[in-house]
């Protein structure tokens, strides 16, 4: 996910994307706990995507 693409979206789309990423993160953690996840680095990628998305949301709401 590119930062430029995120900046073009509005707040409602960003909120939906955040919810989707959090669900994906939960699923990956569950797979990791049950030893079904082969590529553990996916968890870190999703975590960083969530942080990136939250930063963009804060920029748009004027909190940064």
UniProtKB/Swiss-Prot annotation:
GO CC entries: cytosolic large ribosomal subunit
CDD domains from the UniProt entry: Ribosomal_L29_HIP (cd00427)
Molecular function, one GO term: structural constituent of ribosome
InterPro entries on file: Ribosomal_protein_uL29, Ribosomal_uL29, Ribosomal_uL29_sf
GO BP terms in the entry: translation
Keywords: Ribonucleoprotein, Ribosomal protein
Keyword rRNA-binding listed: no
UniProt entry tagged with the keyword Ribonucleoprotein: yes
UniProt cross-references to Pfam families, sorted A to Z: Ribosomal_L29 (PF00831)
Family recorded in the similarity comment: Belongs to the universal ribosomal protein uL29 family.
Protein name per the record: Large ribosomal subunit protein uL29
